[in-house]
């Protein structure tokens, strides 16, 4: 259910972004060609040092040559396992979208990591319970082949003691019973 909420939020965000882009393109077309801002490099790694001298030289050279329009190129957004592509997306708008995305990203990962860490022991416990439930028969068996337990062998010994231990005793008891049962006639 949580996955549905994320995908729905993503779809809504993409729809809003698409509407914004269309509105901006219509306004830009209606207002005419406005001078484009200089293209700047976005820092994707906030802690890294960036050498800006070469970029400044390029910008100065471009300003002297005259204002250049920002080329339109496709914009591809990967989010939540999905990919959204916008055709002919202006570079300045792409920079604005990147700025907006980076400002909103600061608080979101901290919340997700905290929730994930809180769920880990519960998930681990549930996983172990499933594992043990599937293998409880294996855990109960001490060896791969069943051996009679000592309690079972002791219980069967008294039955063996009741029977005669010698074959001679068996013959003697059989002959005594035969003598009793036989009919003797004396004349």
Curated annotation (Swiss-Prot):
User: Transcription: present as a keyword of the record?
Assistant: yes
Stimuli inducing this protein? By jasmonate, wounding, and cold, drought and salt stresses. Down-regulated by abscisic acid (ABA).
Q: Where is this motif: Jas?
A: 121-145
Q: Which InterPro entries match?
A: CCT_CS, TIFY/JAZ, Tify_dom
Q: What is its main location?
A: nucleus
Q: Where is the composition biased (Basic and acidic residues)?
A: 154-163
List the record's Gene Ontology CC terms alphabetically: nucleus
Domain of life, per UniProt, equals Eukaryota
PTM characteristics = Ubiquitinated. Targeted for degradation by the SCF(COI1) E3 ubiquitin ligase-proteasome pathway during jasmonate signaling.
Motif Nuclear localization signal covers 123-130
Stretches the record annotates as Disordered: 139-168
Q: Where in the cell is it found?
A: Nucleus
Q: Which residues form the Tify domain?
A: 68-103
Which biological process terms from the Gene Ontology are attached to this UniProt entry? regulation of defense response; regulation of jasmonic acid mediated signaling pathway; response to wounding
Its biological function?
Repressor of jasmonate responses.
Similarity comment: Belongs to the TIFY/JAZ family.
The record's domain comment reads: The jas domain (121-145) is required for interaction with COI1.
Subunit relationships? Interacts with COI1B in a coronatine-dependent manner. Coronatine is an analog of jasmonoyl isoleucine (JA-Ile).
UniProt-recorded name of the protein: Protein TIFY 11b
- This protein's species is Oryza sativa subsp. japonica (Rice)
The lineage, from the top, is:
Eukaryota, Viridiplantae, Streptophyta, Embryophyta, Tracheophyta
Name of encoding gene: TIFY11B
């Amino acid at each position: 259910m949580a996955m549905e909420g994320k995908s729905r939020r993503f779809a809504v965000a993409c729809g809003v972004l698409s509407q914004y882009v269309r509105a901006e393109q219509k306004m830009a077309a209606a207002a005419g060609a406005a001078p484009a801002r200089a293209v700047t490099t976005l820092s994707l790694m906030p802690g890294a040092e960036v050498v800006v001298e070469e970029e400044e030289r390029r910008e100065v050279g471009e300003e002297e040559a005259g204002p250049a329009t920002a080329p339109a190129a496709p914009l591809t957004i990967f989010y939540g396992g999905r990919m959204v592509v916008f055709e002919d997306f202006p570079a300045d708008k792409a920079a604005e979208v990147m700025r907006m995305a980076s400002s909103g990203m600061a608080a979101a990962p901290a919340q997700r990591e905290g929730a994930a860490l809180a769920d880990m022991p519960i998930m681990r416990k549930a996983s172990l319970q499933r594992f043990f439930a599937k293998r409880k028969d294996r855990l109960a068996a001490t060896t791969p082949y069943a051996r009679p337990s000592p309690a079972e062998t002791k219980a069967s010994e008294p039955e063996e003691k009741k029977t005669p231990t010698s074959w001679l005793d068996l013959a003697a008891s059989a002959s005594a019973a035969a003598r009793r049962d036989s009919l003797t006639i004396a004349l």
